[in-house]
Design a protein with these regions (language model features):
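Bacterial N-terminal signal peptides that target proteins for export
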Residues: 2-11
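N-terminal secretory-pathway/extracellular module detecting exported/lumenal segments
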Residues: 22-90, 94-147
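Bacterial N-terminal signal peptides
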Residues: 10-21
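General helical secondary-structure elements
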Residues: 1-2, 56
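Helix-centric, low-specificity signal for extended rod-like, repetitive segments
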Residues: 1, 14-15, 84
């Protein structure tokens, strides 16, 4: 009887973790383009974060890398504070002028925006042109072409 309760308790824990994981990822939608590096990273947008005002759009983006990114570490575990598997950004896109600016940037030690986080420097006043065949161009196509 004790073994059966314990195994049911373990099963309930596994189911709860899976449900929580799915709900945490519920708003993230993969963005795929032929010009992205297949197998190296996956780009997602948070469909719940899309905000529109006039011809401007704001959106949260998550980039999940297959291999760890950042500077090489030192020591027995080769880890450093600047190593990460995923990043999130909050971007503001001007659809008419095809310009983008970064509002927030965070690196995460683990996949899908999990684990210890480190915020990066952002200059919200700096607008950049949206170059062809880039992540920003894919976001512009997704969010601005169908207005």
């Amino acid at each position: 009887m004790w073994v059966r309760r314990r195994s049911l308790s373990g099963l309930c824990t596994i189911v709860l973790v899976l449900v929580m994981h799915q709900s945490a990822l519920a708003g993230w939608v993969a963005v795929e383009r032929d010009y992205f590096d297949p197998g190296l990273r996956t780009v997602y947008v948070d469909s719940d974060s899309i905000g529109r005002e006039g011809t401007s759009v704001t959106v949260r983006q998550l980039t999940d890398y297959t291999m760890m990114q950042g500077s090489a570490g030192f020591g027995p575990f080769m880890m450093s504070p600047h190593r990460f598997f995923s990043t999130t950004t909050h971007k503001h896109i001007d659809c008419d002028t095809k310009l983008v600016r970064l509002l927030a940037y965070t690196e995460y030690l683990r996949h899908m925006g999990t684990g210890p986080a480190s915020n990066g420097y952002v200059d919200p006043g700096r607008w950049l042109p949206i170059e062809p065949e880039t992540i920003n161009h894919a976001l512009w196509e997704l969010l601005c072409r169908n207005e």
